[in-house]
Structures are given as structure tokens and as C-alpha cells.
Amino acid sequence: MIPKRIAGVHTDTSGVPGMFEGAARISYVDPTGKVWVLWGTEPVDSQGQEVFLPEGGWDDGEAAVDFTEQETVGRFGAGVRGWKVPAFDGELSLWIKGDKRPTVQAWQRWQRAWTAFQPFGQLRVMSEAGVNRYANVQLRGFSKPEFFPRGDVLMEHSVSYRCLDGCWFGEVERFTGNVSLSAGGDLPPLLKLRWDGSATSVRFPAGNTVSLSSIGAERIINLDRGYMGQITDADGNVDSQSWSVLRGVIGGVEIAPGEVANFKLGAGLTLEVTPRFLSPWR
């Protein structure tokens, strides 16, 4: 995709058929919350837009499942002993052009929008149906420019990143009361219980019921496998005291894609379900 006009304050970056199939908009959200629109299928009023993603500018940026196989007892095939989803890498090849400022200043501003330390920025892909996918991305490196341009001329630039989560996330769904959950996505979803801190109880898909005593403050219980019911406050700080009481009582809950699981949530509990995907295009 070649910009139709380089000079002036507006560059048309409307998409063409076949480019980023199924996507409507691609953007980057930096840790401060600023949204950098990089590409769109419809003409975008790019007043103020300084970073553009051309056709062919998206490299890698998709997850993969690493299966551990073992021989079967019979003569045919193999069985799966386990699996994991490792972190993945990606790279964006971009064009930068200053809007009401020299391009080199826009380039510097764009670089400051990325970080190698938490909180990371997010790459977001919105589909034509308005469905969002996002990945938390850690800066791994920038390309070095061959020269520093003067004025508002176009500048080529690339940024490499790593997604430590190993997946793309979808939009959070929230449930209360009796829940029959059918897991979507490509991978088991991220499950969390948002608890208002009042005395209540929850029955898990395995059939076990856990009672929660009042603690007088909102908490989040992470049901992801490996976290074993870790309890944090709204800012993500671990509540060691509350967690120690429930450690060994609440385990991880893993629901395979397409599997149906039933929860019974008492008053003050909300189940938050975040689907996981291997690719933003799915």
C-alpha cells in the first residue's frame, strides 16, 4: 500500500482488498493510554497521524502451541503428553511522517511510546465486525535510521517486540449467578473471580464448593492454572493474608475450547472470562 500523497498534512492510508484479511483497524496503545492508529480499511482522517503500517509491514506476531508427544501403546500415531504456549515475537515495518512537526521529532515520540518494562503497550486489531483482539507487547528493539531526515519527509522504521503472554486476548465477558460457560477461542480462556469482599460461596465445575469469609474489600481471584487461586487487590498487589487462607482450597480451572463448564456464583461474585487466541485474525 503506497500513500497516495506524501506532502502536506494528510496521508491516505485506506486499505485495499486482501490486506490484513478481516481487519478493520490496527493500532498501538502506549502505556499512557494514547492510541496510535496505524492502519484502517476505510479512509482515515489522519490529521495528527504520524505512524503508518504499509502492506507487508506485519511480520510474525502469532502464537503457536508446543505439544509434547509420546508413543501410543498401539501401532499407530502418537499421543499428547502435555502442551505449552511459549512467548512469541513480531516486527512492524512502518512509515513515519511528522504532522505539524519535523519527522525526526515524530520518530522520537514514537520510540518513547514503547517500553521494555511493565506496564507494556498493546497491539490491537479490530475486525470488520467490531471485535477486538489485543496483545501486550514488550519492546525488543528499533531499527537504526540510515539518516535523520529534515522537515516532514517520509522515514522508514521498524520495531521488534515480544509478547510474553504467548497469546492474543479477546474481549472480557462477565457472568453472575448460575453460569454454563462454553469456552471460545483457540486456547483455554483466562478465568478470574471478581469478589466484592462480602461473605459468599462458589461452586466450581469439578463440583467442589468453597466458602469465602468477609474481608471488607474488593479482591480478584485468579483461576488460571499455575496461579492456584492467587488473590490480588484491584491494583494487582498480592493479598498474601487472604491467599494463604485459601491456598490449597482453590485450584486452577482450565476449560478446553468448546468444553462446557458450570459455575454457581454466590452474591458478590462475578466470573470474568477472557478468551485467548493464537492470531489476531481469527
Where are these regions (language model features)?
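A short, compositionally biased
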Residues: 19-24, 115-121, 195-199
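Oligomerization/assembly interface segments of phage tail-like spikes and tubes
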Residues: 70-104, 151-167, 260-261
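Short, acidic/charged, Gly/Pro-enriched secondary-structure junctions
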Residues: 93-140
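Intrinsically disordered, low-complexity segments enriched in serine, threonine, and glycine
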Residues: 2-5, 167-282
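Short amphipathic beta-strand/extended segments with alternating polar/hydrophobic composition
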Residues: 35-42, 46, 133-141, 209-216, ...
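Solvent-exposed loop and beta-edge segments used for protein-protein assembly and interaction
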Residues: 84-88, 115-117, 151-153, 185-187, ...
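Short beta-strand and beta-hairpin "edge-sheet" elements
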Residues: 122-167
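Polar/acidic, low-complexity leader/linker segments enriched in S/T/G and N/D
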Residues: 1-67
